[in-house]
Amino acid sequence: MRTRRDVPADRSGRSRVSRHPGLSVPSRTLEPVQELHDAPLAPLTTFRLGGPATRLLTATTDAEVIAAVREADDTGTPLLLIGGGSNLVIGDKGFDGTALHIATRGFRLDGTTLELAAGEIWTDAVARTVEAGLAGVECLAGIPGSAGATPIQNVGAYGQEVSATITEVTAYDRRSGETVALSNADCAFSYRHSRFKAEPERYVVLRVRFELENADGLSAPLRYAETARALGVEAGDRVPLTAARETVLRLRAGKGMVLDPEDHDTWSAGSFFTNPILTDEEFAAFRSRVAGRLGAAVEPPAFPAGEGRVKTSAAWLIDKAGFTKGYGTGPARISTKHTLALTNRGEATTEDLLALAREVVAGVHEAFGVTLVNEPVTVGVAL
């Protein structure tokens, strides 16, 4: 990790924000694009759930983002960062502090190097890379949210993860008061995890840099069997970029994983639970539970996840534990298209959603001895 520039200390001994070309950072003040008080947060999330924030700021430049963060840190005000809102579960009581909506924009392509501002809409950016003939993120089409969230979660789907193409993340380090550049190794990526997720109070992502591939209009080799089957090719083959993107969008839409305000199956955070990663011993015990419940002929999904570790399918677990598509009678239910998505049918509260999530977690654990972990970040509530 490196800072953009050596930063002298101010009279208090605290380092000032590092300034790099094109970034002018006000020391203490912010002129927000928008400032609201007792502001509803539900419209900023894909669940459309959650109570109000004491104060809501919207920032459209890196300088505004940094100044807002510094102001909150200097005054000891709790701070909630919101990008696309696709990975947030906010409590019904809301957030007692400042919510900062990061709405920065920026798409810069230099050869095969792509740099995105944190607030750039992710699925739009993917579409533009495909139009430019560059491979590496085409199977991540349709994922809701902003570019700045992708390294935090190490976003992945249909055989691709952003950790494979991210080369650098520019972030504001709240501990040092500097703008820093983190390499891929610095980010400490793992399955749906990163340094940013491990230290959520430290880094504010400002920009993300990717190294893509010019493969003469072809995709990266397909790594996901479902995508390959849908395209009529073998895993490992390349296909036209547009075909790969359109196929993924079609597959996602069929599971309610492409945002549509008229479709309550998309009023969700996409996959609500991560796929469990088990040790070999845990997986052996799990297989025994499966055999006892479903019969010796049934083999649970198993994917290598590093030495001595196996990943299995959360969606399979949920379904086999008896939680089928559309499960639930209240305003929060499992999607009618995909068992891994919990949805707001229009009148739900966050507590309704959490009650359903807890029921699923308890049911899966009782059936198979595996504990599901939520993928979305919870604010003011816990599973």
From Swiss-Prot:
Subcellular localization: Cytoplasm
Main location: cytoplasm
Active site: R192, S271, E375
EC id: 1.3.1.98
KW Flavoprotein (keyword) present: yes
Cellular component GO terms, alphabetical: cytosol
Region (Disordered): 1-26
FAD-binding PCMH-type domain residues: 49-215
GO biological process annotation, one example: cell division
Transmembrane feature ranges: none
Catalytic reactions of this protein: UDP-N-acetyl-alpha-D-muramate + NADP(+) = UDP-N-acetyl-3-O-(1-carboxyvinyl)-alpha-D-glucosamine + NADPH + H(+)
Origin superkingdom: Bacteria
Pfam family, one: FAD_binding_4
Required cofactor(s): FAD
This protein's UniProt keywords: Cell cycle, Cell division, Cell shape, Cell wall biogenesis/degradation, Cytoplasm, FAD, Flavoprotein, NADP, Oxidoreductase, Peptidoglycan synthesis
Biological role: Cell wall formation.
Family under the similarity heading: Belongs to the MurB family.
Annotated protein name in UniProt: UDP-N-acetylenolpyruvoylglucosamine reductase
Organism: Streptomyces coelicolor (strain ATCC BAA-471 / A3(2) / M145)
Upper classification of the organism: Bacteria, Bacillati, Actinomycetota, Actinomycetes, Kitasatosporales
Gene responsible for this protein: murB
